[in-house]
Structures are given as C-alpha cells and as structure tokens.
C-alpha cells in the first residue's frame, strides 16, 4: 500500500489551484515599487518620496469575527477587516502603508474560499495604496477542524523621522477628537457570540435596519484618508499625483465596499500629509481590544489624563443591544468595545477650526487634563 500527501490531508493540487485563482487579484495591487512577481521566495519592494524614512511594522488578526463569516459562508469582507485594522494601527504613528503580507490556515484547503478572502485583502490594499506582496496559505489537518480557518496580516509602512506621532508632545488643554466607527470592527466578538448564541444571523433587526449577520460582518473602517488631511505636509501636494502612481481612484475607493471610508486618491508609498493645510496632531489611538481606556492610555504621558465626555458622540444601536441583552456594565462595555469611536486624535485647541474644516465628521469628545494618580483615561457623565 502506498500513501500520498493527499492521503494525509494535504492537497498540493488544491493549493496550486488556489494560487491560480488569486494571482490576478494580488497583481492588481502592484505598482512600480514591486520588483518581483508572484511565486518567488521573497518580495522586493523599492520605495521613495521620503527624506529620512522610518519603517513602521505591525501584525494582527481578526479574532473570532471569523466565526460569523464561517457561519454565513461569506468570506469576501474578512480580508477588508484585516487590512484596514493593520493600516489603522501603523497610522497612529503617522505612517502611510507600503506593503502587506497575509497568512491563511485551514484544515482542508478550499480554493474558492481562499480566493474570496484574498479578494477582500486585495480590494482593501488597492483602496489604501498598499501592495499585497506575499503571503502563505497553509493546509493543516489536525490543527483546524471542519470549516474553521485563521487569518493574520503583516503590514509595513513609513513615516518621516521628524514627523513621527507618539503622544510625547500631548499637553494639558489639548482637545480629543473622535472619528466614528462603522460598528464592532474586529473586537469583542467572543462576548457577542456568547450573548447572541442561538440567535439567527439572517433575522432582520428593526433597530439595526438590517440582518444581524450583515451588522456583525460590517467591515472595519479605515481612517487613512481623513487622517491624511490632518497631518502636517510631508511632500508637495502635487508630488506623486496621478494614476501612474499606483494609487486607487476615487471611484475605486468609493466602490470598494469600505462604505465608511472617505473617497479620494491614495498614493502608494507616499508620505502622509499632502494636504496644503496643517494640523498639529500630537497623539493618535486606534480603538481596538481594550476599548477607549485601554488604547488611549497608551499615548498619554505621565502626569496627564484623557478626559472623555460620555454623550459627546453617538453610540450605534448594536452596542446598546449587546449591553441590554447581557446586562453588561458600562465599564465592561468600555473595556471591550469601541462604542462608536474607532479612532482618536489629540490636537492643540488652536487647531479646532482647522480640524472641523478638514474633517467635518470629527467630533470633540474630551480634553487632556492634569492627573494626580496613575489613571490615564477617564470617561465622565452618562
């Protein structure tokens, strides 16, 4: 009796088929900066447009939101979640994305599922001017069972050394601005699934205006474009413009499925801050796991505290439904979910009018005050 790799649960032919299905999607994210094709051992990327670039790297996943995608057998948006999450993470330093890599692992490789996932990755990479330069698709029988799979992403961006944003310049009196989230984004799904266990995902919820499944799969919003308008200029406004730069057009961005993302051209690999107006952004936080307190505290210097005013921003119905269903205390909700704020910026009060002019959706949600103890974040009112 002879055995093959397929007998052990690994289908090389299925893997090759998956690669064939995703080739064009991946290639569609390439610009002239990508020096290698698909299938090499490593990806070569040449970038310019910076005086003194600092590379910024991050890795992340999408958590158990995957279980919702699996339950609905819809895999075309989970890649959008992953890319946008990673872009937002490096954006907090002022970095623009350069390139992205992904890792997909499943118990039994299904080429069509891989193609749907990578299609979402490529769509978001195009919208954000980021090249999808490589990845790994692993078939791992015995590690993942049934339809389960996992997804992780790795991003590299760049920022000028003298334009790094790290929170160190945050001062008492600075204003805190919030940008609305598109919903749960990619955090808190284990609690949500526990509370909604047995609830049909295809049931229409009047308070949501759509089915529960549609609400839970709403893509993680990307904040690159609104933040780009606020950051101080890095390069002249005319530099790198035009379709030859590899950037996504406004039509492509608007039709990308990232409905909360502002339309507008994105130049791959270009330094942020091409807008003519300047706002002194002193700190930025992406509100993910840990909520507002856990993430904003990471950028507040000692002796200062971020004071948020509860009620100064809208909280989407999905969060209210979760809190009521599980009788979850507000303190726990704040620790787990973004509660309507997906991204936070800290700017001096003198820039108030410029912030409102450049990003009308930005909401003043608090201010920086002096702190007596170790607490870096406080939410008052409500």
Functional labels for PLM-detected ranges:
Residues 61, 157-159, 180-185, 193-196, ...:
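Glycine-rich beta-alpha junction loops
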Residues 2-9, 24, 113-131, 144-151, ...:
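Glycine-/charge-enriched secondary-structure boundary and capping motifs
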Residues 1-35:
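N-terminal amphipathic/basic leader segments beginning at the initiator methionine
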Residues 2, 61-70, 204-211, 300:
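Gly-rich Lys/Arg/Thr-decorated short loops/hinges at beta-loop-alpha junctions or inter-strand turns
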Residues 21-182:
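Glycine-rich phosphate/pyrophosphate-binding loop regions near the starts of catalytic domains
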Residues 10, 14, 78, 187, ...:
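A generic structural signal for residues located within well-ordered alpha-helices
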Residues 50, 54-56, 61-63, 201-202, ...:
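Acidic-glycine-rich active-site phosphate/pyrophosphate-binding loop
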Residues 184-230:
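Glycine-rich, acidic
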